[in-house]
C-alpha cells in the first residue's frame, strides 16, 4: 500500500473566504502514485473548513450570505464564547456547519468526483496562517 501525507498552508486576507484547492489536491494524488484508494483533505483548525461543492461564484456568495444569517459575526457579545475575550464564536459555528474534512475516492489515479464537484478550503476567522492535512492511501 502506498501513502502520502502533505501539509497545505493558507493565510486568507480578511475574515472570511473560500479557496478552490482541487488542482493542488489533484497534483498530490498524481505525486502519490496511488491508482485506487482514498484521499482525505482535513482542515486542522477549528475555525476553518474543507468541503465539496460547485465552483460557481454565485453559490460561494450565497454561502457567505447564508452563513452570516445563521451565525452573524456582530454583535460579538451575543456569544458566550466571546465573553472570554475572543471575537470568533461565529467562525466556530460556521465551521461546524460546513464541516471539517472530505474524503474522495481515487479511481484510475484520479479524484473520482461527481459532476461539478470541487474541493474548497473555507476560512471563517482569517488573517493568520492555517494548515490543511492531505493524506492519500491506496494501491
What are these model-derived regions, one by one?
Residues 1-139:
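Active-site histidine-anchored catalytic micro-motif
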Amino acid at each position: 500500500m502506498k501513502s502520502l501525507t502533505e501539509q497545505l498552508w493558507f493565510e486568507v486576507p480578511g475574515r472570511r473566504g473560500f479557496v478552490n484547492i482541487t488542482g493542488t489536491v489533484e497534483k498530490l494524488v498524481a505525486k502519490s502514485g496511488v491508482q485506487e484508494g482514498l484521499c482525505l483533505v482535513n482542515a486542522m483548525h477549528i475555525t476553518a473548513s474543507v468541503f465539496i461543492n460547485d465552483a460557481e461564484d454565485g453559490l460561494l456568495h450565497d454561502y457567505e450570505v447564508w452563513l452570516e444569517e445563521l451565525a452573524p459575526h456582530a454583535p460579538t457579545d451575543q456569544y458566550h464564547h466571546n465573553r472570554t475575550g475572543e471575537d470568533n464564536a461565529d467562525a466556530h459555528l460556521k465551521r461546524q456547519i460546513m464541516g471539517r474534512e472530505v474524503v474522495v475516492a481515487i479511481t484510475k489515479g484520479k479524484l473520482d468526483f461527481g459532476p461539478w464537484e470541487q474541493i474548497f478550503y473555507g476560512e471563517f476567522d482569517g488573517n493568520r496562517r492555517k494548515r490543511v492535512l492531505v493524506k492519500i492511501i491506496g494501491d
